[in-house]
Amino acid sequence: MVPVSLRAPNTGAGGNRVGVLMCNLATHLSDPAHRLETVRNCMNEGKAALQAMSPAQVLAMSALGAAPLGVEMFLGRRGPLRPPFNVVISNVAGPRTPLYWNGARLESLYPLSIPTTGQALNITCTSSDDQIVFGLTGCRRTVPDLHPMLDQLDAELDLLETAVGL
């Protein structure tokens, strides 16, 4: 599941306009360029579909994916339904210029998230000052050791950068 901003650029209006997409992560594909293309196409198609909906339609569609969590909150215990996803991936755009506090430059800004019931892993990346960093938060029962995932993430990013010529 990927939360996406649906706010039009330069509107100046307050508030959030957010929807959620289910994205094919293409983990079944061995070619990194093909994986990246598949994810990009899936996200572009999903965003276009959400942009074509009214705010009420986006809310209703997004609520379908969160329905199992709502049932659990209502019942006060794990409900009979499981969420249709157990991985959330999010990107939070940060400032493009360096930040300082008392003259000290901020070197990195690492994101943090809180997994909800039924969620195994949250991957949030954030950008600041022309760099991007990743924060991984996992359910200790489902993902007892996140460290190997960091190594795999570094290796995958290297493959993707090579595939696109960076």
Model-derived regions, located:
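Helical lid/core segments from catalytic subdomains that handle acyl or acyl-like groups
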Residues: 12-95
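Solvent-exposed residues in well-ordered beta-strands and their adjoining turns
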Residues: 5-7, 24-30, 128, 137-141
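Small-residue-rich loop/turn and linker elements
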Residues: 1-13
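Low-complexity, glycine/alanine/valine/leucine- and proline-rich hydrophobic stretches
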Residues: 83-158
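Flexible helix-coil linker/hinge segments at domain or subdomain boundaries
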Residues: 48, 155-166
